[in-house]
């Protein structure tokens, strides 16, 4: 929800200070609208609404589909599959693919089909070696912060029990970032 070229770490006051990332704009606008609705309900009705903005969340029942997942679940799954491939642990690879097929390739596929689909997602056996090459993606320059979903829930409960909306809005803050906020 923060501007595309927002300084790091992101601070609450950076909201609405620049252009949004075009690929994320509809999501960001919806989130910003929710924050503004809570803010204006407080101003008009003195409702005790506090908006929070989590960092990248992960946890149980996350989406580990390499075609549609977010960053951390994809990284975890790719690392797991690469480790299994390097250890020649075909049973674990097949079990993983039976639970979450990749482009309709399940654990019932041949070793060659599995190796081909894994290489499409940058998990490859190094030729004439037992080693595996794993490429995540990008340059490695973007900074990301991750938070376990139960920690997010704990933060929300803490805020509900210890912060009044008046405290927040009197500081001219419309929402609270949940995360470490450090480089």
Question: What name fits each language-model region?
Answer:
Residues 62-63, 142-144:
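Heptad-repeat alpha-helical coiled-coil signaling segments
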Residues 51, 146, 183:
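Short aromatic/basic micro-patch
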Residues 43, 57, 73-135, 144-176:
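Alpha-helical substrate-binding/gating segment
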Residues 1-58, 62-73, 80-81:
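Catalytic helix-loop patch of NAD(P)-dependent Rossmann-fold dehydrogenases
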Residues 179:
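Conserved S-adenosyl-L-methionine
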């Amino acid at each position: 929800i923060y501007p595309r070229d927002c300084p790091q770490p992101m601070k609450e006051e950076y909201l609405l200070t620049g252009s949004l990332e075009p690929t994320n704009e509809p999501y960001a606008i919806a989130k910003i609208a929710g924050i503004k609705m809570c803010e204006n309900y407080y101003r008009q009705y003195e409702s005790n609404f506090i908006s929070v903005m989590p960092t990248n969340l992960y946890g149980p029942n996350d989406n580990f589909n390499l075609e549609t997942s977010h960053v951390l679940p994809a990284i975890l799954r790719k690392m797991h599959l690469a480790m299994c491939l390097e250890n020649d642990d075909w049973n674990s690879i097949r079990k993983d693919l039976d639970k979450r097929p990749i482009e309709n390739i399940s654990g019932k596929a041949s070793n060659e089909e599995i190796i081909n689909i894994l290489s499409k997602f940058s998990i490859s056996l190094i030729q004439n070696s037992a080693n595996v090459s794993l490429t995540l993606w990008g340059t490695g320059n973007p900074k990301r912060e991750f938070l376990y979903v139960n920690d997010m829930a704990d933060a929300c409960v803490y805020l509900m029990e210890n912060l009044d909306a008046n405290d927040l809005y009197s500081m001219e803050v419309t929402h609270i970032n949940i995360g470490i906020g450090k480089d």
